[in-house]
Regions:
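A structural signal for short coil/turn segments at secondary-structure junctions
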Residues: 76-77, 108, 187, 255
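Conserved AdoMet/S-adenosylmethionine-binding subsite of the radical SAM
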Residues: 91-223, 228
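Conserved functional loop/turn residues at catalytic and ligand-binding sites
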Residues: 33, 37, 42, 133, ...
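Active-site mouth loops of central-metabolism enzymes
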Residues: 54-62, 197-202
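Short glycine-enriched, charge-decorated loop/helix-capping segments at active-site entrances
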Residues: 52-57, 153-156, 165-166, 234-238
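N-terminal [4Fe-4S]-dependent radical SAM core
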Residues: 1-29, 34, 43-59, 71, ...
């Protein structure tokens, strides 16, 4: 791994609220495919107007991403982090994701590299992620028991086969557990993202935070589910701001809570709150 000082690592605006006032991030939308189907996601990522995770104006190739960054860094010196978060799952498109990080490591050695994933295809790539100098990884964990997971996920595609129900959730949870443990053993900074879904996992978040603490995760981000058209959860209400605040207060003793998330698009660029 590239040597980083604590000051370097602390300049990630998502992992450090103070840094978000001074530093921004850029997400490179190089990974369009996904290996799980969440019941709150319609997998339609080509959108220029919606401001939520999983959407982008276009998908870039690794080379297009480098050209974009070369132009960006000419007028944005406040971008400290290059991240890959979709619009699908970066580890489902591992070849594109890792090739992009390889190019970024070579062309922009001072930038922090960041990855966001559901964790299903994470374990087998941890060594390569470390080699490429990725320092911050976010894993989205919406359940830590198969019964709850079976309500969140429609299916999981693992080793070329689709799995459903509790079997699917059990596979995903085992892979997340293995991947996160490997990340922490490698010295990575790890954030756990949890989509809070009323009537599904809202009363389960405390169990997720306890597991995150057990993993040694560094910070947790509880995000309100956004109802999306043409999904199984399209008619569910998004949890209120007060409900999210209550959850954060109740689990803050387990693990530090991120309170400044802007639920970034897969092509987000700038400080949090900017597109």
């Amino acid at each position: 791994m590239i040597f980083r000082t604590k000051a370097d690592l602390d300049s990630h605006p998502c992992f450090n609220k103070k840094a978000s006032a001074s530093y921004g991030r850029v997400h490179l939308p190089v990974a369009p495919h996904c290996n799980i189907q969440c019941n709150f996601c319609n997998r339609i990522y080509d959108c220029a107007n919606e401001n939520r995770p999983g959407v982008t104006a276009k998908v870039q190739t690794p080379d297009e991403s480098v050209k974009f960054l070369e132009k960006l860094f000419k007028f944005r010196q406040d971008i400290s982090v290059i991240g890959i978060a979709g619009p699908g799952d970066p580890m489902c498109d591992a070849d594109k994701t890792l090739a992009t990080f390889e190019k970024c490591k070579s062309h922009f050695p001072n930038a922090l590299l960041c990855l966001s994933t559901n964790g299903l295809a994470l374990p087998e790539h941890v060594d390569e992620i470390v080699r490429l100098g990725v320092s911050h990884v976010t894993v989205t964990v919406n359940a830590v028991t198969p019964d709850v997971g079976s309500k969140v996920y429609s299916w999981v595609r693992y080793e070329g086969k689709n799995y459903y129900g509790e079997e699917a959730a059990r596979i995903l949870l085992a892979r997340q557990d293995e991947g996160i443990r490997k990340l922490k053993e490698a010295g990575m900074l790890v954030k756990i993202n949890t989509v809070v879904i009323p009537g599904v996992n809202i009363d389960h978040v405390q169990s997720i935070s306890a597991k995150a603490k057990q993993w040694g995760a560094d910070i947790m981000n509880c995000m309100a589910m956004i109802p999306v058209h043409d999904t199984p959860f399209e008619n569910l209400k998004s949890p209120s701001t007060e409900e999210i605040h209550r959850i954060r207060r109740s689990i803050g003793g387990d693990i530090e809570q991120m309170t400044h998330c802007s639920r970034c698009r897969a092509d987000a660029c700038g400080k949090l709150g900017e597109r």
